[in-house]
Regions:
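C-terminal regulatory/interaction regions
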Residues: 2-18, 289-357
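N-terminal amphipathic/basic leader segments beginning at the initiator methionine
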Residues: 7-32, 36
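Conserved beta-strand hairpin/beta-sheet module of binuclear metal-dependent hydrolase folds
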Residues: 26-88, 208-224
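Divalent metal-coordination and catalytic microenvironments
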Residues: 35, 55, 65, 97, ...
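Short, charged, surface-exposed secondary-structure boundary motifs
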Residues: 49, 126-131, 226-228
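Metallo-beta-lactamase
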Residues: 61-71, 165-178, 185-187, 192-285
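Active-site HxH/HxHxD metal-binding segment of metal-dependent hydrolases
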Residues: 72-74, 78-187, 214
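Aromatic/hydrophobic pocket-lining residues that form the small-molecule binding cavity
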Residues: 77, 245, 249, 325
Length: 357
């Protein structure tokens, strides 16, 4: 249904309503709200897709997110531009954040249509920094970080070999951008969209809220079925992204009307934002309780995976799982509930503090 009202294909799942029916195939689009087209591009990952959106903008379109830099994604855009987008020009490209599945083709699209790129400052600058790592040697600080987490020499060697891979998934970024900040209002076509900033999954994530009819482009800040990765990385080993994430979720729950129609980057558009935000918050609180039980015995970051993840952690997701484990450990440390001691081999062993026992 065009306005997010439940139609014959609508279904309910865990307190959320999905009104929009089956997702579009690559190159196709579904009108999910007035002036909003939902499209989908494949990802060569276990999370096998990203949703991208086109917003009617006068005689053209504003795009929100772009997919990875792959031939399949480019073909999907070519088909969409010639098909549901009607051959109209792209006037602006907005990226919710700097992860490659979101910015991968931003530069390609901006150059093709001479369109400006709109992002928050921290996301743009972080993307440029990570792209610049391509071809550079892996820093020793990263090896120290992962050894402290409990990685083996072999795992650290593989990390060194793959270092700088971010740039391979991202087309060259525009050398200039337009900054988006909290509470900015963008005029897109006949509509005003308010910028809402989230934190935790990334430094300065942009969401877009059309307050007139309650349409909310959530990016990765609110997903219907999975919780976005929240990780500490070697560049900021003492960071507290989980604290930022939880504070953002609490603030969004207090701010957003319960009847919003949420258009996420993964999964399907849904109603039930308050229910979903509460579930995300509760999920991390439950994980922290399991983690505290694990820390009754000294543990490395890699030892706490079973407390946080339902499935075994393979090498393909080891860095993300490690980052998320350290995010939870750092959070407990800031709360005075956990401490760490580094042994002579450079490995951190985490335990509960006396106050938390």
């Amino acid at each position: 249904m065009a306005d997010g009202v439940a139609g014959p294909d609508a279904r309910m799942e865990r307190g959320l309503t999905y009104p929009s029916g089956p997702p579009p195939e690559p190159g196709q689009a579904v009108a999910v709200a007035p002036g909003v087209l939902w499209m989908r591009l494949p990802l060569p990952l276990s999370l096998n897709h990203i949703n991208v959106y086109a917003l009617a903008d006068g005689d053209g379109w504003t795009l929100v997110d772009t997919g990875l830099k792959t031939g399949v994604s480019k073909a999907g855009w070519d088909a969409a531009l010639a098909g549901p987008l009607g051959g109209k020009p792209i006037k602006r490209v907005i990226c919710t954040h700097m992860h490659p599945d979101h910015i991968g083709l931003a530069g390609w699209l901006c150059e093709r249509f001479q369109a400006p790129l709109l992002m928050s400052r921290l996301e743009y600058v972080t993307a440029r920094m990570l792209i610049a790592d391509e071809g550079q040697p892996a820093p020793d600080a990263g090896a120290v970080f992962y050894r402290a987490a409990g990685w083996s020499d072999e795992q650290i060697a593989r990390w060194r070999t793959g270092y700088g891979g971010f740039g391979k998934a991202v087309a060259a970024m525009p050398a200039a951008y337009q900054r988006l900040s909290e509470n900015d209002v963008l005029r897109i076509g006949d509509d005003d969209w308010r910028v809402v900033i989230g934190e935790g999954h990334c430094p300065e994530h942009v969401c877009l809220w059309r307050e007139g009819d309650g349409v909310f482009l959530s990016g990765d800040q609110i997903l219907p079925r999975i919780s976005s990765n929240v990780s500490v990385w070697p560049t900021e080993p003492e960071g507290d992204p989980l604290g930022e994430w939880l504070r953002s979720l609490v603030a969004l729950k207090a701010r957003l009307p319960s009847d919003l129609f949420v258009l996420p980057s993964h999964g399907e558009p849904f109603h039930g934002v308050a229910t979903r935000l509460e579930a995300l918050i509760r999920g991390h609180e439950t994980a922290l309780k399991r983690l505290e039980r694990t820390l009754r015995a000294p543990s490395r970051a890699v030892d706490v995976f079973p407390a946080l993840f339902a499935r075994p952690v393979g090498d393909e997701v080891l860095s993300m799982a490690t980052g998320e484990a350290i995010a939870h450990l750092n959070y407990l440390a800031r709360e005075g509930r956990a401490r760490r001691d580094r042994d002579e081999a450079g490995v951190d062993w985490w335990t509960l503090t006396e106050a938390a026992k």
